[in-house]
Amino acid sequence: MSRFFSKKYSALTAYVPGEQPKDQKYIKLNTNESPFPPPQSVVDAAKSEAAMLQLYSDPECTPLVKKCAEHFGVKTSQVLMTNGSDEILNFAFMAFCDAEHPIVFPDISYGFYPVFAKLNGIPYEEIPLREDFTINVSDYVGIGKNIVIANPNAPTGIALPLSDVERIVASNSDNVVIIDEAYVDFGGESAVSLVDKYDNLIVTQTFSKSRSLAGGRLGFGIACPEIIADMNTVKYSTNPYNVNRMTMAAGYQALVENEYFANCVEIIKQNREFTKNELESLGFCVLDSKTNFLFAKSDKIEGKVLYKELKSRGILVRHFTLDRIKDFNRITIGTLEQMQRFIETVKNIL
């Protein structure tokens, strides 16, 4: 680091994203992207804005917010569009957390949560998952601190039922509860239906997973109008034009193409069950996933060794070094052909 780097960030361990190889020789099963491209109408919508890139985008994302509100059955004042769901999460941390308002989250979850906390000088606590990697809801009921929970969780893939989410939200009425629903379309229950009932609830989602726009960077939050206004204050104090014109147009059209994306999700879910069954037949322990990935380990091979062997054979998966999960690998679900290739490669390695 340089001699000018602020001391408040010098001890910060940055988030480490999944590998993005520059060549095309790998089957990428490591970053939970969709294996399916967006439909042509979405591509065309993005292209239609390219000729106007000399102009700033609409900071309010007006047509997209209206379409998103219509899609989810909420008011436009309850929606905030952002540059990926990471940005809405960071806005929430900045707006509602500080030394007097710490935040808690599971010890095995999205790696950005502790980074956001440290970046913004927010005290935080990581609450251990149970031995089976499920969340103990009682740990969060009435805890009296801000909360963020990924549901379904990542990297485990395990989902909480909506009734448990509501218990947590209802019992912490004086604190903000953020439900990160990046993977909800693959089998989870969305908490959007609870937003009108609880003014302390923020639901975040992304277009990166089920709507094939990871490269476009588009996410959003749904909450009561007052919460959205607070986060807009943070947004307009940092990056008013946070969603570019092409992404905004692509996102709008992606909300039109519901049938296409629902079909893609169904195929991914089928491929997930195929892969799970095949891995279990090989002796793997595979957690119950409601996402577009599987979290699996084998007693026959260490997690890091399997990761390296797969990479040497042209397949990327995600390995984590955290002690409790170091024997696991997270496997994104791709096309059936990709998953068949993955299974055959695993068989050869074992």
Predicted segments, located by residue:
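N-terminal "arm"/small-domain region of PLP-dependent enzymes with the aminotransferase-like
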Residues: 1-55, 143
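PLP-dependent aminotransferase class I/II
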Residues: 60, 200-280, 284-287
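Phosphate-binding glycine-rich loop
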Residues: 62-102, 120, 300
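PLP-dependent aminotransferase-like
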Residues: 95-150
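Active-site pre-lysine segment of PLP-dependent enzymes
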Residues: 134-143, 155-177, 181-213
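PLP-dependent enzyme catalytic core of the Aspartate aminotransferase-like
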Residues: 163, 308-313, 318, 322-350
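Conserved PLP-binding catalytic core of the aspartate aminotransferase-like
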Residues: 268, 281-313, 329
